Amino acid sequence: MSFLGNQAPAVLPTAASQATETANDRAALAAQAAELNARWQGASALEILRDAVTNVFPGRLSVVSSFGADAAVLLHMVSEVSKDTPILFIDTGKHFIETLMYRDILVGRFGFTDARALEPESADIAKFDPTGDLWSRDPDLCCRIRKVDPLQRALEGTEAWITGRKRYQTSARAALPFAEALDGRIKINPLASWNEEQIRIAFREFKLPEHPLFDEGYRSIGCAPCTRPIGANEDSRAGRWAGKDKTECGIHTAENI
């Protein structure tokens, strides 16, 4: 038995105090995102990336990459700033073999020292998708166990993460800021203001290798069962979850704060 002597008894937090603390945390994070957007107004994508990696969140952020059609542009910039920044790839078990090959090519070319593959929990697959066709029956749940949950686990302990999203990709991303407050972290979008022509110019200027499926009409490349080539007048993400009432996998659609 141990004795506390004259120490005051511990005060357990009440539900109200916890709610207040959470609200304060959210407000502080939203304020930080607003400050970063003001700080990065007029900055180039490389300047935003360099500032985030070396000044604002040194050692406390990760890059999340799909290794899709445009991925080489952001990854090239990251390699110019730091080859040691963690590069997270969500390996759903449903990717095109071409994407896995492309991932290995880019990681080797850019010399990243901390590239990680995030996989779903085997227990979740056994429970929810033992036959491997959950994508056709419940695509939201499939994305949840294969993408959202593995990423959330990998981001524990980090303060920020970097994405390659751009405003031109869909109408839902038209107002995409450089910094967002989301799920207790800052999400950074250095390429938010880029257009498709700038992406193509970067590929040519830096002689970046194309995704093997790009020339087949794939512009947004996710899991093989849920991705198709796009038509001439479709936006770049029209080939994702075609025929379903779904446009995002879920890693970017949690409640903004």
Model-derived regions, located:
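Nucleotide-activated chemistry modules centered on ATP-dependent adenylation/adenylyltransferase
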Residues: 2-257
